[in-house]
Amino acid sequence: MLFEQGQLTLELPECTMQKAAYYENPGLFGGYGYSKATDTYGYSTPHQPYPPPAAANSLDSDYPSSACSIQSSAPLRAPAHKGAELNGSCMRPGTGNSQGGGGGNQPPGLNSEQQPPQPPPPPPPTLPPSSPTNPGSGVPAKKTKGGLSASSSSSTISKQIFPWMKESRQNSKQKNSCATSGENCEDKSPPGPASKRVRTAYTSAQLVELEKEFHFNRYLCRPRRVEMANLLNLTERQIKIWFQNRRMKYKKDQKAKGILHSPAGQSPERSPPLGGAAGHVAYSGQLPPVPGLAYDAPSPPAFAKSQPNMYGLAAYTAPLSSCLPQQKRYPAPEFEPHPMASNGGGFASANLQGSPVYVGGNFVDSMAPTSGPVFNLGHLSHPSSASVDYSCAAQIPGNHHHGPCDPHPTYTDLSAHHSSQGRLPEAPKLTHL
């Protein structure tokens, strides 16, 4: 089938060349794996085209030991070739055999079996088989070392989790405080497993003491906090956090009370205008209710800071003579100044309608004689109140009646210029203002 018996010495050199080329190539293919050489490439006895090395001189002999000879010769030639040369030498058996064989020498089954190994990529080159035990043993040794190191690292990592790591800071503090005090700590929440912080459950006795302390002091100093911590069997941190939360709750309650108790329109931002613009408006923090009132502040101390600004007290504490240019605008026949009663710093207008006047330090709108607004500024606090005394009557039944005033002049300019005169100074003196 493969070779005819008539091929003799004429074809012997070609056969030896082909045999040499062929036995180099099976060494390359043997590098893929010794056990799969017979199965993958079909180096079986019926398909073997060339004689083995033992029967190289006799071409007429059979080929019983071809597979064994390939397996024995492959390890000897495999170390000489690299993995990069395997790709280039895969076609050498087909080309060498087709050139030297002369058509009839190349079996059809060999080409069909040599072409399928081309598409799969070549595996990495094997280690030199001269010492097959050492590298083989070295690789598992490395793997075992890596496995041992990984297992040892995992064991060390698992061993590094100590029981004190599972406890939080607060739990350890609670345990320490329980151990030092020797009392029962059942009122506190039990320490959870590996939790960040537990919610503190205060007893009723602790809450009573904390509320009592908060009623007197909203901010605790550290000595008092230490004392409370020892008294209530709590930590300083717990007491500090409780006071912070209690202050926030108090602030929220105050905001809610302010919104509920002050209806719309009675906030300081919506305060009414002055009495000259609104005829029947008065501030009755200390006055009895008048029928024309529109603003009744429920708590005057709450608006103590805005009272001087709301009603312009700074304008009323000025010297009395500064108001003369304002009254110079009225006609002369209608303006009848009254003499000062017992040197009291006050004047009123009888014929003027809707003109603001001073009556002993009380601002009176003469548009409504009996029920008009009265701005009693005696209760207001002002920086200049030391030199100005508002001590006159609040209610004035008529425009021509003056309340009992202080016998001593309260305005410094009045005592300097108007004490000797019975009438007010002439208006032209103050035209330069």
UniProtKB/Swiss-Prot annotation:
Give the GO biological process terms.
anterior/posterior pattern specification; cartilage development; cell-matrix adhesion; DNA-templated transcription; embryonic skeletal system morphogenesis; glossopharyngeal nerve morphogenesis; Notch signaling pathway; positive regulation of gene expression
Cite the record's Low complexity compositional bias ranges.
146-159
Where in the cell is the protein located? Nucleus
Give the SMART domains listed for this entry: HOX
**Gene name of the encoded protein:** Hoxd3
Where does this protein come from, organism-wise? Mus musculus
User: In which residue ranges does the UniProt entry place its DNA-binding region annotation?
Assistant: 195-254
> What keywords are assigned to this protein?
Developmental protein, DNA-binding, Homeobox, Nucleus, Transcription, Transcription regulation
What is the stated purpose of this protein?
Sequence-specific transcription factor which is part of a developmental regulatory system that provides cells with specific positional identities on the anterior-posterior axis.
Query: What are the record's GO terms for cellular component?
Result: aggresome; nuclear body; nucleoplasm
Quick one: where is this thing mainly located?
nucleus
Q: What is this protein called?
A: Homeobox protein Hox-D3
Instruction: Give the motif span (Antp-type hexapeptide).
Output: 161-166
Q: Name one Pfam family in it.
A: Homeodomain
Q: Tissue expression, per UniProt?
A: Detected in adult kidney, but not in other adult tissues tested.
Return the Pro residues bias intervals: 116-132
